[in-house]
Amino acid sequence: MSLTITPNIPDPDGFYETLINAHEGLTKDESDALNARLILILANHIGDRAVLAAALRAAR
């Protein structure tokens, strides 16, 4: 599996709205914790260490 960095989410604006809404009403600490949990859930779903390493490099 390779890292996909081209747009790949159907209705990206809808997803972004869902993501923002998930943070509604949270404190900064709660929002940071939500982001951390989401990252770990998605990393577990991907499961491929090489893809995760490539994603970390791309994000940095």
What are these model-predicted stretches?
Residues 1-4, 10-14, 21, 28-29, ...:
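N-terminal intrinsically disordered, cationic/polar leader segments
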Residues 13-16, 39:
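Short amphipathic alpha-helical surface patches that serve as generic macromolecular interface elements
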Residues 15, 34-35, 52:
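N-terminal alpha-helical segment
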Residues 19-20, 24, 37:
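Eukaryotic low-complexity, mixed-charge intrinsically disordered interaction/regulatory segments enriched
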Residues 23, 43-46, 59:
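Generic structural signal for hydrophobic core residues of well-folded globular domains
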Residues 26-36:
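Structural motif
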Residues 34-46:
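An amphipathic alpha-helical micro-motif enriched in hydrophobic residues
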Residues 49-60:
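Short, charged early-sequence alpha-helical segments and their helix-coil boundaries
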